[in-house]
UniProtKB/Swiss-Prot annotation:
Residues 49-139 form the ATP-cone domain. Binds 1 zinc ion. NCBIfam families: transcriptional regulator NrdR. Disulfide bonds: none annotated. Negatively regulates transcription of bacterial ribonucleotide reductase nrd genes and operons by binding to NrdR-boxes. It holds the Pfam family ATP-cone. Keywords: ATP-binding, DNA-binding, Metal-binding, Nucleotide-binding, Repressor, Transcription, Transcription regulation, Zinc, Zinc-finger. It comes from Psychrobacter cryohalolentis (strain ATCC BAA-1226 / DSM 17306 / VKM B-2378 / K5). InterPro entries: ATP-cone_dom (IPR005144), NrdR-like_N (IPR055173), RNR_NrdR-like (IPR003796). The keyword DNA-binding applies. This is Transcriptional repressor NrdR. A zinc finger (unnamed) spans 3-34. One of its GO terms (biological process) is negative regulation of DNA-templated transcription. Its cofactor is Zn(2+).
């Protein structure tokens, strides 16, 4: 690791600790040349599978696109940023755990819907209406009935 102050290549680790709930390693370093101290963070590089669109086109996974598609139905809902970020992390984890190099957008959409369903019914129906291309009010009624099958 090069020193950010003098660009020397010889540095030593003074302290290492887990950070971000174990997702990162925080290291305090000292430069052997100028004795300045600095902090680095080490994270695992995660490779997400490519997404196969319904048209057959293959695109790289896009975290921003996932985030936008989830945040839109969650607008004006009582969901905290931490809950939103947690859901995005769970979705990405489920996709990675599939162990595939390519995943269809249909599978990704179903994972998103299952996560939204457990988080917020209204956001789930909003997302489902676009994802499943609801054409009339009956489609909404049917989806709501599926959420609450025992209620009349």
């Amino acid at each position: 690791m090069h020193c950010p102050y003098c660009n020397a290549s010889e540095t030593k680790v003074i302290d290492s600790r887990l950070a971000a709930e174990g997702a990162q390693v925080r290291r305090r370093r000292s430069c052997n040349s100028c004795q300045e101290r600095f902090t680095t963070f080490e994270v695992v590089e995660v490779v997400m599978p490519r997404i196969i669109k319904s048209s057959g086109k293959i695109e790289p996974y896009d975290n921003d696109k996932l985030r936008r598609s989830i945040l839109l139905p969650l607008q004006k809902r009582p969901i905290t940023i931490d809950e939103q970020e947690g859901m995005i992390s769970r979705i990405e984890k489920r996709v990675r755990q599939m162990g595939e190099r390519e995943v269809s957008s249909k599978v990704l959409g179903e994972i998103i819907m299952s996560e939204l369903k457990t988080l917020d019914d209204v956001a789930y129906v909003r997302f489902a209406s676009v994802y499943r291309d609801f054409q009339d009010i009956d489609a909404f009624h049917q989806e709501i009935a599926n959420i609450r099958p025992n209620e009349k």
